[in-house]
């Protein structure tokens, strides 16, 4: 699949080559709760520029192993594939993707505050995101949309 890949940080957003369009492996179902979303739209915000600038480098990439990274944390699209435990979703369903993947078992998650979950990943920030043709996430992060909503028009709301 094609993806927009961040290759190096650029403190001043001056280099034209900090992001490249590349062919990368398609995401694969690995866990029973995994969902693959075919991306229909991905938002761009100041967070993305902060990632390029390396503002959060010490928090998300202290050991300097994160790059290359597929950015994009505001995503919507259509279900492409689901793991064996996923119910109520089928290929082609329009969805919006909650930006943080969490386990759902820590106290914060059980209280409904999963943005503060202990064992989370943030696609597009500290693992591959949605500036690609497809994104792997968890069923916990999927919100099914009505057929009347177009993913590219709602992606930035995720």
Language model features by range: what are they?
Residues 1-2:
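Extreme N-terminal starter segment of soluble prokaryotic enzymes
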Residues 25-43, 57-107, 141-149:
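Glycine-rich beta-strand-centered segment in the early N-terminal region that forms part
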Residues 14-18, 90, 157:
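Short glycine/proline-enriched turns and hinge-like loops at secondary-structure junctions
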Residues 5-29, 46-81, 96, 114-128:
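N-terminal glycine-rich cofactor-binding segment
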Residues 64-66, 73, 103-158:
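NAD(P)H dinucleotide-binding glycine-rich loop of Rossmann-like/cofactor-binding domains
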């Amino acid at each position: 699949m094609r993806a927009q890949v961040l290759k190096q940080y650029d403190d001043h957003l001056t280099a034209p080559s900090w992001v490249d369009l590349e062919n990368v492996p398609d995401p694969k179902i690995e866990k029973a709760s995994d969902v693959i979303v075919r991306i229909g739209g991905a938002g761009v915000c100041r967070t993305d520029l902060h990632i390029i600038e390396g503002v959060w480098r010490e928090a998300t990439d202290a050991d300097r192993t994160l790059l290359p990274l597929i950015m994009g944390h505001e995503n919507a699209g259509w279900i492409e594939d689901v793991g064996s435990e996923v119910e109520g979703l089928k290929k082609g369903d329009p969805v919006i993707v909650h930006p943080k993947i969490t386990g759902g078992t820590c106290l914060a998650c059980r209280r409904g505050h999963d943005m503060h979950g202990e064992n989370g990943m943030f696609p597009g920030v500290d693992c591959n995101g949605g500036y690609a043709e497809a994104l792997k996430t968890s069923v916990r992060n999927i919100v099914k949309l009505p057929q009347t909503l177009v993913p590219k028009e709602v992606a930035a709301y995720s």
